[in-house]
Amino acid sequence: MSLEREEPQHFGAGPAQMPTPVLQQAAKDLINFNDIGLGIGEISHRSKDATKVIEDSKKHLIELLNIPDTHEVFYLQGGGTTGFSSVATNLAAAYVGKHGKIAPAGYLVTGSWSQKSFEEAKRLHVPAEVIFNAKDYNNGKFGKIPDESLWEDKIKGKAFSYVYLCENETVHGVEWPELPKCLVNDPNIEIVADLSSDILSRKIDVSQYGVIMAGAQKNIGLAGLTLYIIKKSILKNISGASDETLHELGVPITPIAFDYPTVVKNNSAYNTIPIFTLHVMDLVFQHILKKGGVEAQQAENEEKAKILYEALDANSDFYNVPVDPKCRSKMNVVFTLKKDGLDDQFLKEAAARHLTGLKGHRSVGGFRASIYNALSVKAVQNLVDFIKEFAEKNA
């Protein structure tokens, strides 16, 4: 069986297309890793080889994001949904460990994923409230992020265990252009951000975040593993909250496998880490480094988003982009046709050109082009050409 393939043009939202060189190397390593006679999925997660994979991946991520010494990198099984739970209980405990009392978490709801994260915190009986729901500022629909002047009064002078946001909402095509200044400038607020769909797509200042979580299967690897970047001070605060105190205050206890200090203390291997999945993630890190790092990747991503949105806007009598231009996602471009009855034809003709994965999320319909890091400018240009031709033919 050959490890060669024609470069895909797959715009699926995740699991997403991956760099072919990464998959080729991973396939070889699954059979015989570093000439040790075993595949990487067969080695002990506590062996020297596995430990080196863990350490190398952290080293490469630190280089890519310029992660300061104030923060720690670790990995957990699961995905973003697992993180919804672990963030809520760990960060609630951190606040108790620091202050000896509880405070609500605050959620900025800009789409379905931040909404689901809030709902999970409530389900677990972690004190939580919505600071704003973007639907309230956009006629009952997601697709806009309200200016912070409209909601910053809701956080001034108020204690929160953390403030949560999803930087890029894949379903609704909404992305925060930057972190809200009112959060960044408040030393009492720990920002917790879900970067599952835009991690390593653009430069960020890690020092501004209390916790970053990112599921792997969109921009950095295969499903089943999530990376975390956390302030070391938060880890210390979590450890400072005893189970007895948490019980007395009614704060749920985090299951041991998802207790952040325990995971960090055991180098992400307290529970058997899927080392093959982590190795693939590290191969992605190395691939981006070889391309010129996050700065080069960001320039490429901005070019892809630019030509795609320009094509849709130039044919605005035929296509509709239901997202405020101020917060249009550079990762997930959502759009609909203004003419009824053509959706299936659009997908069929796109597939004939090997442009796949364009169907919109079942909850919103229409179309979604996910242009993650692994999608080339050429692939997006091919989609742009098709979008223009389809509009001309069916206007």
Curated annotation (Swiss-Prot):
Q: Name the Gene3D superfamilies on file.
A: Aspartate Aminotransferase, domain 1, Type I PLP-dependent aspartate aminotransferase-like (Major domain)
Q: Which reaction does it catalyse?
A: O-phospho-L-serine + 2-oxoglutarate = 3-phosphooxypyruvate + L-glutamate; 4-(phosphooxy)-L-threonine + 2-oxoglutarate = (R)-3-hydroxy-2-oxo-4-phosphooxybutanoate + L-glutamate
GO BP terms, alphabetized = L-serine biosynthetic process; purine nucleobase biosynthetic process
Q: In which pathway does it act?
A: Amino-acid biosynthesis; L-serine biosynthesis; L-serine from 3-phospho-D-glycerate: step 2/3
Q: Does the keyword Transferase apply?
A: yes
Q: Where are the transmembrane segments?
A: none
Enumerate the InterPro entries for this protein.
Aminotrans_V_dom (IPR000192), Aminotrans_V_PyrdxlP_BS (IPR020578), Pser_aminoTfrase (IPR022278), PyrdxlP-dep_Trfase (IPR015424), PyrdxlP-dep_Trfase_major (IPR015421), PyrdxlP-dep_Trfase_small (IPR015422)
Which keywords has UniProt assigned to this entry? Amino-acid biosynthesis, Aminotransferase, Phosphoprotein, Pyridoxal phosphate, Serine biosynthesis, Transferase
Chain positions found as Phosphoserine: 112
| Biological role | Phosphoserine aminotransferase (PSAT) is a pyridoxal 5'-phosphate-dependent enzyme involved in the second step of the phosphorylated pathway of serine biosynthesis. Catalyzes the reversible conversion of 3-phosphohydroxypyruvate to phosphoserine and of 3-hydroxy-2-oxo-4-phosphonooxybutanoate to phosphohydroxythreonine. Plays an indirect role in purine biosynthesis.
What NCBIfam families does UniProt report for this protein, alphabetically? PRK05355.1 (NF003764), serC_1 (TIGR01364)
The note filed under miscellaneous reads:
Present with 15900 molecules/cell in log phase SD medium.
Q: What is this protein called?
A: Phosphoserine aminotransferase
Instruction: Tell me what organism the protein belongs to.
Output: Saccharomyces cerevisiae (strain ATCC 204508 / S288c)
